[in-house]
Structures are given as structure tokens and as C-alpha cells.
């Protein structure tokens, strides 16, 4: 009818109007003949066929075929090995067939929906107790020790400095400048290494 999509055919053609059409297809369905007609490939003024070799019609058919739904077709891997790779730690291939580069991104196969459901069910029955990272615990303990050491050394020196019991945060500007210099030196050393 038109080269672009038409929502209301009544905008272009009214019932009873005479139009030029081209027969583009004929099918038998349930003892009936289905006839496909096209107004696009015929000049409506003269009735001349604009697509005598049916090139435009074939292109449209190809476009329609490409939009078919392929969700029912599942990609299946035929031979998945029941092994674990020594290089990357992923299942399904040997180390000699592994393409992973050292320090590269690791990829593994996505489990089927059925396997995910089974894993979810087993996870509901068995809820493991979360274990904390031991390195985090060590870091926290070291931090607490340093904090305690600072408090004890500060409290010793602050008793002699102030009579009210409160310790002074910054005793002098000279010590503050010295700390900044030390920090800068440490910072520079880190970048050089």
C-alpha cells in the first residue's frame, strides 16, 4: 500500500476506489486459495509495473524472515568435559586448550536454568555461616593496638603538660611542620618504588 507503515488504510484508499495491484503470491490453505496483492510496486496513475523482476518483493520477504523469533532454539554445547582447567580454574576444558592470559579476565559457562533451580533449592536447606576474612581481622587488631599505644604515650606526656587532665592536640607549629615534611618524604619514596 505504501513504502512506509500505514496505521489506517482509510487515509490512503477508500472503499470502492479503483486501484492498480500486482499479484505477488498464491497459496492453498484448507481448500481455499490465498492471494497476495501489492499496490507498492505498481504506478497508480498508469498501472505500470515498477518491479518487473520482483527484486523489491524478495528483499521485503528476506526482511520479514530475519525478524522471526529464535528464542525456542537453544544453543547447546555438545562436548563439555567434566574437568577443571589448571590455568584458570574454570570447568569444561584442559589447560592445553585454555586461552586465558595471566592476569586476564576469567569466563565460565553459564549453568542451565534447571541447574540454577536445583542450586537455589539446596541453598535454602543449607545456609552456611558467613566467615569473615582473617586478614581484615588482623588489620583491625593492629589498628586498635596502635590506637592504644598512642593513647598511652599521649596520656603520659599530657599529664605533665596540662593541669586540667585534657591533652593538647597540637603542642606547637614546629612539630606540625616537621610531620608534614616527613609525610611528603614518605609519599615521594612510595612513588619512586
UniProtKB/Swiss-Prot annotation:
Residues 134-150, 178-193 have a biased composition (Basic residues). The modification Phosphoserine is found at residues 66, 135. One of its GO terms (cellular component) is nucleolus. InterPro entries: NA-bd_OB-fold, Znf_CCHC. Residues 113-193 are annotated as: Disordered. Signal peptide: none annotated. May interact with PNN. May associate with the 60 S ribosomal subunit. This is Zinc finger CCHC domain-containing protein 17. It comes from Macaca fascicularis (Crab-eating macaque).
Amino acid at each position: 500500500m505504501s513504502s512506509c507503515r500505514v496505521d489506517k488504510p482509510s487515509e490512503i484508499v477508500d472503499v470502492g476506489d479503483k486501484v492498480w495491484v500486482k499479484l505477488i503470491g498464491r497459496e492453498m490453505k484448507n481448500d481455499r486459495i490465498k492471494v497476495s496483492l501489492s499496490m507498492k510496486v505498481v504506478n497508480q496513475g498508469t498501472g505500470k509495473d515498477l518491479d518487473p523482476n520482483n527484486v523489491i518483493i524478495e528483499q521485503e520477504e528476506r526482511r520479514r524472515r530475519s525478524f522471526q523469533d529464535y528464542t525456542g532454539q537453544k544453543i547447546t554445547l555438545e562436548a563439555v568435559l567434566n574437568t577443571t582447567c589448571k590455568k584458570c580454574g574454570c570447568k569444561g576444558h584442559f589447560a592445553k586448550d585454555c586461552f586465558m592470559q595471566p592476569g586476564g579476565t576469567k569466563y565460565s559457562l553459564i549453568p542451565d536454568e534447571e541447574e540454577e533451580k536445583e542450586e537455589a533449592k539446596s541453598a535454602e536447606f543449607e545456609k552456611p555461616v558467613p566467615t569473615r576474612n582473617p586478614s581484615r581481622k588482623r588489620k583491625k587488631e593492629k589498628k586498635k593496638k596502635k590506637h592504644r599505644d598512642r593513647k598511652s604515650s599521649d596520656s603520659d606526656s599530657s599529664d605533665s603538660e596540662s593541669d586540667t587532665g585534657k591533652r593538647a592536640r597540637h603542642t606547637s607549629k614546629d612539630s606540625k611542620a616537621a610531620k608534614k615534611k616527613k609525610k611528603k618524604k614518605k609519599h615521594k619514596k612510595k612513588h619512586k618504588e
